[in-house]
Amino acid sequence: MTKRLTWEQKSIVSHDTGHALVKAVPGSGKTTTLVKRVERLVKTGTDPRSILILMYNKSAQVSFTEKLKTALMSSVIPEIRTFHSLALKIVGYGERQQIIKKKDLITPSDYRYEQLVKQAYRYGFDHEANYIDPNEIENFELFIARCRAAAVTPVDAANDPTFSNIKREFIHAYGRYCELLEENSLRTFDDCLIEAVALLRNDSSLGAHFKHIIVDEYQDVNLIQHDMTRLLSKSDTSVMAVGDVNQCIYEWRGARPDFIGGLFERHYPNTKVFQLSCTFRFGHELSLMANSVIRRNSTKLTKLCVSHPSTPKTEVRLHFDNCLSKVLSNLSVSSGTQAILSRTKANLAWAEIALRLCGLPYRYLNGSSALHTRTEIGILVVGVLLSVYGDLRLLENHPNKQAIVYGFLKEAGFRWQKGQFKAALSGLMAPHADLWSALGQLFEGAQYQKDRLGRLATICQKDGEETPAIDVLRRLIMEGFIDSVGSEGVTRTGSNDQQRGVVRIWELLDSSKIDSRTFLNLILNPGEAATDCDPFILSTLHGSKGLEWDNVILIGLNEQEFPGGKPDDVYSVRTSMNTPPAEEEIEEERRLFYVGITRTKQQLNLVVPLDEGLARWLKNRWDSTPKKSPIATRFVYEAGWTACAFTSDAIYNSTVEKQKADFSKFHQWYLRDLQRLKV
């Protein structure tokens, strides 16, 4: 970022007292602005200890602390905390005063927490096997987080009509989870927030020394965090909230866009509203596209995101191709950081296989490869092993054998009876276990299961290592072993994600024509990747929030899955995957697309399916929402890529005045804002 502040930044830095709301677009230099503001407050006589700065996560808190220390050139700096760490401090005070019961803090990284969650899950879902699908545990944890964010107790969840269509298993498991915490005198960070708010309500002197409170990423706060901020604010406190309603993408875990979209101004009288509408991250073409998409939401767009002259001339490309490996092979990506982002985990699994096929390095943003934990991968791998070798010899001593066998058993459609699944998994995990005898003994007297096992036997050793993997997949489909994928899922979204995973892998195998042995090696024994370029970072769009890369590839841009359902959708699994999302869900998904494309600095690649309608939209330079259901996601239509490229070129070529009549009213608005900013 340039050292000179824009006039928008200067007005925030010089704000004196009183409540303020700062609406900041992606990459607008808000951290620099807030550091300068705090620096000014301290230099004009404000006691640093009377300033509280609340950051959304630990990494942001650490980064801001270092920058503020450098700016103030002092070890005495304001209190900079996450909501969780402040809550922990307040809870510690409550324990010392013997107002609340003393408990141990348990964090997600603690092995006891993992055991506790699994124990609660087994209770709620009557789950017998020792191994539990990590994706199912993640869904359960998200449900817990959503309940905690709104201070919903198990009794509330069981009796509140708004929870009537939630799967009962989740509520039973949640109840057991809360009991286990209490029985073991444990509390989580989410519990700390709830208890801290209760303490603040009962003791108004807590936090009374804070005269300035700054809250970053306010669009991501939930009800408990919002209440905490209000209770810390006294009559002489100035609260400044900073955020962007267009980046509120965590509603499914308790965030509320209305806190920044209107409630803040209602709760804090005489709030002064500031804008940070100038981005330092990407060029005009991408700014125009981001504005074009997000204006379709019901939240009134009063200021556009406008690119600063110092930003790179970001290049946007569209690829009409379902084969990611072809796109990766043809990309002339310049040097720099690079990421592949997706709405769903299924597409990340597809991307991982494509990257392995191309010999390109990669790593997941959060954690290691999850390919082996996907149940559709389990049944495909076992299906190919049986089709080629007739047994599971290649899985012997493989580190991921249990996860792969679990996936196979989960998706094979055996209609497990009580106790069978656990016995089958244990039997197949034994050294040199024979699948046919292990399952055959288990299915004695169960005709459907015996018939199912017999159908599986018909594919044995029908193919060789050189047989195209797509042919083996076709055989599995013909025998009915792919139809059941996703049918045992705990959540509707999880089930749909697994089904889409099969579709993505079908597309990759069909286009690449790799043989069965190559497919098995890609999954079980991937080769060494190239070392002459930065690894691709794989992340969901939700996980990419707050980050940026030089080059970004967006995949999974199909209308059928984006807009999709909530990531932690815990409603009935049998609901049709084609149920159209509600308008408010579409708006959250549109914000998610907006967040995704604005992670880019230099080059954005959008991988879309073949769609004649989109081709027509681009040819005519349209940017409207299609009335008929499209093939590619509606958000790519709304982005109006060709129209934005046309206007962007005019700006960079200094031909705006000559071509003014060719620009839409919306793009003329952008040009006026660009001129008005005088950046």
Predicted segments with their positions:
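ATP-hydrolysis module of ASCE/P-loop NTPase motor domains
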Residues: 78, 96-173, 178-184, 408-416
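Conserved RecA-like helicase ATPase core segment
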Residues: 226-316
